[in-house]
């Protein structure tokens, strides 16, 4: 822990900042400023966290300077990247395209800038490490970033000229049959550190005969940004959103205080942490999730090919007409449509998760849709697998390492019910306009809708939605800056107006998988909850220590979170 002199120095600076905080004139300290911490102070911080302070570098620099060059398998491995403090899954979030000149570090580059990567990282192993890091950032007026694994589609886990707190080493997993919340028995649960990836967590739960609601990406951290954004799952139609099933958080807030947060203790912050946006509330060090008895399930993967965009659109209209067929089965499904440029065709891959039924029953459930869809395309692959659900949702790794941005919308159940043919027109228009992939997620309805009574920061649109649809936009390292800008803006400029035909306007989106340039993020990500979230933000983070792209309070700061603009 820090000594008395270090802590007194922090306190004096904090008191000064509290007096001098003056809106638009207020900026964070950056290298070159007279008040930027000296090497001696960084060394003191390193001693205080037992030598766990490291310099953060972009992943390309890590590979060239520290690893002797990364293989293709390493570069595209999310598990590999999670171990690199400065790495993000999508490499574009490590770049600073906007500065003049830009600060960029690309794979195999001989000239690397720091980009959007933090200056230093604390590889925290204890709550005390986190508290010291937050206190140091506050005392020295530094930009602060928090990263669990780097599985982040809006660049919220990294920040230029910042100090990063990495929770990757919080690998604790504790199961309890009778978890207590403020003395009350909340039932079977698991407490998970904010560094535990899902592939580890699901297998640990299997050993206990348990399952919990979470995603299917191997390196997503259940207790990280995933749960703060709400957390959808292939099990959501059966069991609800992840945020519907969280019982407690352990969090370090902006004043370096460690809190247990639940329905009875700091209930306002508990409300905000369940859907109020990733990275805005503090450093979560653990979360406790309700668990359920594990069960057998059938997973299926069906692949179809369509010759052109009209045929693909017809398949998707057919899918929309059949989507309620599976309600009684509580089926979750990922339906991904994409262009196959090598075959000059369009593909649809449907990965379905059927709880507690056999493969024959699952095949029978899909058959009416597939029979109708074959009028417009060809089935080129079909697999059914009976398995334990923990194995069904476990993946080994995630393929990453590209330059990719997203845009998304929640699609109301009423649109599927009343206008299923419109889905065909929308898919055709999107691909005709140059879309590369449209990723559908049947992760709403069922228990998600039934849980509308739960008072949390989840956008109310989740309770009336049927699906969550994402568009992806990517580019090569060789792409010009002007073209990168066009691609980054493609969702709002050309794709969203088409998608709104089924999403409505103003629509809603899942804030973890969305466009960081969303113009009205308050409405789109948070809806009527935003005023209450803003009030809670002022209460727990009055100085804006935890500012992220399109997060609560971010409109009061510039794009880098370095200077106030209000």
Features from the language model and the residues they span:
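Classical eukaryotic N-terminal signal peptides for Sec-dependent ER targeting/secretion
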Residues: 1-15
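Soluble FAD-dependent oxygen oxidases
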Residues: 2-6, 21-566
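Hydrophobic h-region of N-terminal signal peptides that target proteins for export
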Residues: 14-22
